[in-house]
């Protein structure tokens, strides 16, 4: 047995080592609680990794000290032969769904509850708890004396499946509860996959040529039902607790809201998007508020849930057909529906990209009737195997362009053929007849016609005139169509040519009276006072968005310096890689583009130029801001411009890396999260003072 260091023959652990190991476990549990529950980590990831490695090394050297609840034991168990059935001690009941998806649904639920309790109008409102209805997989976690002993799916409500081996791989879920734990505590909640995690996972899978997940919900459900926990551990899963099952040896709080607070104190993640309010008005307001911010949430929901807050009233209300009378799910209009893809058309964008567009049998989804959906490009068509005549699932979320997310292949008509975009258009641009090509490194098929192509010309003008570019008010799509179709505007510079664009020529167009024509001329004159970054963005250089345009303007300071820069010089600009650098260099290498720029400047477009300076000298360099609510005297776009002009960055979400949150009136969850994280919060006056320093 010489040299044996592990297993039954390990030497006894030195005195005090067991205490050190347990202290390391407690430290890791605290770090997990701060990161996953409080969303306020106290140490960087590197320190967490260091402590974890130290614990792992000690346990490897002294396996007799390993315990089932150790953080090192989350991953690595053997694969299961099958998922075993589990009978729930307290049934996992489903919740009735309110059929009215408008705010009226809240009033319907309140009326039923009041009737069941025998309340009269003069008896006053009922207190309710309102929370989100997550689109994931319902889960029951059983803790005994503070240790996680079992995790089970809902199944039919009476019997689920044992998935403990997979749940243990989730760092969000504590293997040991914090503080004084009950004898038995069953926690009910939802396993889900956030949208950012879903996108990152699929991007990695595509990069390695592996299968991708269809949607976050399927990803969560499929991951939890894996037989091999090592596979589940590779999936980025999350969990929210929202209720109780069996409890023993625990003083259950008096209200549902207090239950959630108690679960959070025990170390379980609880969603902060919840509220307590009086009466149906509060529920309807919650439904409307969450509906408005639904698409900004990092996870999928399909509605909200209302519960009578007092647990004694819940017991009095009881159940009906295995559904509680004291709760209801109030859904939003569906964001995904099935319909038939009747045809595929193509559109030509300002960069020449020829995009396939699905023409659909009209379907009501996401609150509107949808007849078109983007198919993105040939790669996406191939990946989803989309064909004309297919029954497809269409998704529309908020203002996002509807897209075809999947195909119901069981309903595919006989004789359907794969769709090849280049073949469908005969290898030619459908607008100008120029050759269409697909470069090896690109997903898009492109027209080679440039500004000879009317479609590219129209889109280039609309982009040039857009609010974040030259901001030419009144130059909309219908007017641009006329200007291009009647050959009044062939290049961007023609917009400022008084021989082509004047009162006489404009007033002769459809729906352009003298006043409208004069307003447009005034807007064109006003747009001549520009900024360098807006002008760069307005030129429509491929791969150059607002942020890159600002970086270029800040770095070079002068347009002629930017025009003279080669690919290597351009790559010295922050966040400009070889692809973007090549796009910029190729754009300015074209004599036609340089001529248009000369004419634009000759027409009077100007800005203040500097010699350029490193961004590090900017007063807000390295600072990240988040804007929320309504500011008294300026729009969010104006505030964003001021911050970025001073070298700061503006983000759409609050995190521990946020430097300042600028809050106006009616600030929402971003302000609450900032307060929870202890971040610096400014009003408009505070922001202006900071900018003036």
From Swiss-Prot:
NAD(+) binds at residues 45-49, 94-95, 131, 154, 190, 307, 331. Its cofactor is Mg(2+); Mn(2+). Residues 615-693 form the BRCT domain. InterPro entries: BRCT_dom, BRCT_dom_sf, DisA/LigA_HHH, DNA_ligase, DNA_ligase_AS, DNA_ligase_CS, DNAligase_adenylation, DNAligase_N. SUPFAM superfamilies: BRCT domain, DNA ligase/mRNA capping enzyme, catalytic domain, Nucleic acid-binding proteins, RuvA domain 2-like. The active site is at 133 (n6-amp-lysine intermediate). CDD domains: BRCT_DNA_ligase_like, LIGANc. One of its GO terms (molecular function) is DNA binding. It holds the Pfam family BRCT. It catalyses: NAD(+) + (deoxyribonucleotide)n-3'-hydroxyl + 5'-phospho-(deoxyribonucleotide)m = (deoxyribonucleotide)n+m + AMP + beta-nicotinamide D-nucleotide. GO terms for biological process: DNA repair; DNA replication. It comes from the Bacteria. Zn(2+) binds at residues 429, 432, 447, 453. DNA ligase that catalyzes the formation of phosphodiester linkages between 5'-phosphoryl and 3'-hydroxyl groups in double-stranded DNA using NAD as a coenzyme and as the energy source for the reaction. It is essential for DNA replication and repair of damaged DNA. Belongs to the NAD-dependent DNA ligase family. LigA subfamily. This is DNA ligase. The lineage of its organism: Bacteria, Pseudomonadati, Pseudomonadota, Betaproteobacteria, Nitrosomonadales. The gene is ligA.
């Amino acid at each position: 047995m010489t040299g044996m260091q592990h297993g039954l023959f390990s030497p006894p652990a030195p005195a005090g080592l067991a205490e050190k190991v347990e202290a390391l476990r407690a430290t890791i549990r605290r770090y997990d609680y701060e990161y996953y529950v409080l969303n306020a980590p106290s140490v960087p990831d590197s320190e967490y990794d260091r402590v974890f490695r130290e614990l792992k090394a000690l346990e490897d050297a002294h396996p007799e000290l390993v315990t089932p609840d150790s953080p090192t034991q989350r991953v690595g168990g053997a694969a299961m032969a099958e998922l075993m059935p589990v009978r729930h001690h307290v049934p996992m009941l489903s919740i009735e769904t309110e059929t009215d998806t408008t705010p009226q649904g809240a009033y319907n639920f309140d009326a039923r509850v009041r009737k069941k309790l025998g309340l009269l109008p003069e008896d006053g409102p009922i207190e309710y708890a309102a929370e989100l209805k997550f689109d994931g997989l319902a889960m029951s976690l059983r803790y005994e004396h503070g240790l996680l002993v079992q995790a089970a799916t809902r199944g039919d409500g009476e019997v689920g499946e044992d998935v403990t081996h997979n749940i243990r791989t989730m760092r969000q879920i504590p293997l040991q509860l914090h503080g004084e734990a009950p004898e038995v505590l069953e926690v009910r909640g939802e396993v889900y996959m956030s949208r950012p995690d879903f996108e990152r996972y699929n991007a990695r899978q595509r990069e390695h040529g592996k299968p991708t997940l269809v949607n976050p919900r399927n990803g969560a459900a499929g991951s939890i039902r894996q037989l091999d926990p090592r596979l589940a551990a590779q999936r980025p899963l999350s969990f929210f607790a929202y209720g109780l099952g069996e409890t023993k040896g625990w003083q259950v709080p008096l209200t549902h809201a207090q239950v959630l607070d108690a679960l959070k104190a025990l170390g379980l993640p609880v969603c902060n998007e919840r509220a307590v309010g009086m009466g149906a008005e509060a529920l309807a307001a919650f439904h409307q508020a969450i509906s408005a911010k639904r698409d900004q949430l990092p996870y999928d929901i399909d509605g909200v849930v209302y519960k009578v807050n007092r647990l004694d009233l819940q017991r009095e209300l009881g159940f009906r057909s295995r559904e509680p009378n004291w709760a209801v799910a109030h859904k939003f209009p569906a964001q995904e529906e099935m319909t038939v893809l009747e045809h595929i058309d193509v559109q030509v964008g300002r960069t020449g990209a020829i995009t396939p567009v699905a023409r659909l049998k009209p379907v009501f989804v996401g609150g509107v009737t949808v007849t078109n959906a983007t198919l993105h490009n040939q790669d996406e068509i191939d990946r989803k195997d989309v064909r004309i005549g297919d029954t497809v699932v269409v998704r529309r979320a908020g203002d996002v362009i509807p897209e075809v997310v999947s195909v119901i292949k069981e309903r595919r008509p006989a004789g359907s053929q794969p769709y090849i975009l280049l073949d469908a258009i005969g290898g030619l641009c459908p607008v100008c007849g120029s050759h269409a090509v697909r470069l090896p490194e690109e997903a898009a098929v492109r027209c080679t016609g440039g500004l000879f192509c009317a479609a590219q010309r129209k889109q280039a003008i609309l982009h040039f005139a857009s609010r974040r570019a030259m901001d030419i008010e009144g130059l909309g799509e219908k007017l641009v169509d006329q200007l291009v179709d009647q050959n009044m505007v062939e290049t961007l510079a023609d917009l400022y040519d008084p021989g082509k664009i004047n009162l006489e020529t404009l007033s002769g167009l459809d729906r352009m009276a003298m006043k409208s024509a004069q307003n447009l001329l005034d807007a064109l004159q006003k747009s001549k006072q520009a900024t360098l970054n807006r002008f760069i963005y307005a030129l429509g250089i491929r791969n150059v968005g607002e942020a890159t345009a600002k970086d270029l303007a800040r770095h070079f300071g002068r347009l002629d310096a930017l025009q003279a820069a080669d690919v290597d010089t351009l790559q010295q600009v922050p966040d400009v890689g070889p692809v973007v650098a090549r796009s910029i260099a190729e754009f300015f290498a074209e004599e036609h583009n340089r001529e248009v720029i000369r004419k634009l400047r000759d027409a009077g477009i100007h800005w203040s130029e500097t010699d350029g300076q490193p961004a590090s000298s900017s007063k807000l360099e390295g600072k990240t801001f988040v804007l929320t609510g309504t500011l008294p005297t300026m729009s969010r776009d104006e505030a964003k411009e001021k911050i970025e002009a001073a070298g700061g960055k503006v983000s759409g979400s609050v995190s521990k890396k946020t430097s300042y949150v600028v809050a106006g009136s009616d600030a929402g969850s971003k302000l609450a999260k900032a307060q929870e994280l202890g971040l610096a919060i400014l009003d408009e006056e505070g922001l202006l003072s900071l900018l003036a320093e």
